[in-house]
Amino acid sequence: MQKYALHAYPVMALMVATLTGCAWIPAKPLVQGATTAQPIPGPVPVANGSIFQSAQPINYGYQPLFEDRRPRNIGDTLTIVLQENVSASKSSSANASRDGKTSFGFDTVPRYLQGLFGNSRADMEASGGNSFNGKGGANASNTFSGTLTVTVDQVLANGNLHVVGEKQIAINQGTEFIRFSGVVNPRTISGSNSVPSTQVADARIEYVGNGYINEAQNMGWLQRFFLNLSPM
């Protein structure tokens, strides 16, 4: 018996180590795919002897005299001013009650049944009540501010720009990631080549991190299992 117990200790230690290693479940990123884009090389212009070459390589290296320099091609950069401030609240309540009472008795009892049902011995009365009262509420608010420079990775058919970008900040033993993607209307871009995040359609903003501090904030899958299984 002692021999089997000695063999059981390594197995138990291996199981504990396995459960500990699988304690952290990685979350699916909100912004997926590449977070940058490279400019598409244009065709080499053919010199026609004129000062102005109409075959400019998709505006690269060409700046109109009376026009602001704004992103319009794949690979151009744009600054997103993060100004997110969202709050929501919800409350609900419900109550219901019901009472009931029933009585049963004999007004007249035959003489030969007086011993059993006489003097209100057969009278019955039942009553019941049921009540319910429930309340619920939820509050949520988030604030996000900052700046992030993104890259145009797609020019849509109507001229809108799909942008995507990422910023990484390494602090001690962890790394913070700020990812952004969305669709920008070129008309909303200011002269400083920036646009508020509130004017970006289909915006995806993600602020996550990795490292032991981030792992300590996540509940293990075994804890989640018992949390969902427990009736308390």
Swiss-Prot record:
GO-annotated biological processes: bacterial-type flagellum-dependent cell motility
Chain segments annotated as transmembrane: none
Annotated PROSITE patterns: PROKAR_LIPOPROTEIN
Database matches in Pfam families: FlgH
Record membrane topology: Lipid-anchor
Record carries keyword Membrane: yes
Keyword Acetylation: no
Lipidation (S-diacylglycerol cysteine): 22
Domain of life: Bacteria
Localization, UniProt: Cell outer membrane; Bacterial flagellum basal body
Keywords: Bacterial flagellum, Cell outer membrane, Lipoprotein, Membrane, Palmitate, Signal
Gene Ontology MF terms: cytoskeletal motor activity
GO cellular component annotations of the record: bacterial-type flagellum basal body, distal rod, L ring; cell outer membrane
Lipidation (N-palmitoyl cysteine): 22
Signal peptide: 1-21
InterPro entries: Flag_Lring
UniProt function note: Assembles around the rod to form the L-ring and probably protects the motor/basal body from shearing forces during rotation.
Subunit structure: The basal body constitutes a major portion of the flagellar organelle and consists of four rings (L,P,S, and M) mounted on a central rod.
Family: Belongs to the FlgH family.
Name used for this protein in its record: Flagellar L-ring protein
Species whose genome carries this gene: Salmonella typhimurium (strain LT2 / SGSC1412 / ATCC 700720)
Record lineage: Bacteria, Pseudomonadati, Pseudomonadota, Gammaproteobacteria, Enterobacterales
